[in-house]
Structures are given as C-alpha cells and as structure tokens.
C-alpha cells in the first residue's frame, strides 16, 4: 500500500514536470478510491482556501494522502502552519 499519494501538491514555480507529477498522483488516488481525480483536486483546492482564511500555510511542505483499508477511505492532509492570521 502506498503510504503517501501526494507530495507537495502545490506548484511552486518548478515547471510542468511537477504539475505532471501532481496530476499523476491524483489519477493514482482516483484509481484507489471512488472519487474521480477532478473531485479530489477540487476538494484539495477548497480545503486549502478555507484553511488559508485563518492561517498562513507553508505551501512548500503541504501533503495530501489517501489511505484505504477494507472499511474506509481517508483523505489525510498535512498542512504545516507558518503563523495564525489576525481575526478576520
């Protein structure tokens, strides 16, 4: 079982090679879950949008993974926080 599907899903000016790797990982995650790749990508974007309203994230260290066992599939997000933003 692959323990980490997504490594640094954010693009950080590393070019199209990193983009291709990110998309491939989404496809692999799709193959192992009932969610399609575009839904997974949209979930990732929306999660980050909401969390970013409250904290500044270390975008170079973000990790998303999907773990599946016989009973469930879990989306796991590792979102390192640089600092907490002031009240909105």
UniProtKB/Swiss-Prot annotation:
One of its GO terms (biological process) is regulation of division septum assembly. Gene3D superfamilies: Cell division topological specificity factor MinE. Its main location: plastid. GO terms for cellular component: chloroplast. InterPro entries: MinE, MinE_sf. Keywords: Cell cycle, Cell division, Chloroplast, Plastid. It comes from the Eukaryota. Pfam families: MinE. It is found in: Plastid, Chloroplast. Belongs to the MinE family. Prevents the cell division inhibition by proteins minC and minD at internal division sites while permitting inhibition at polar sites. This is Putative cell division topological specificity factor. It comes from Guillardia theta. The gene is minE.
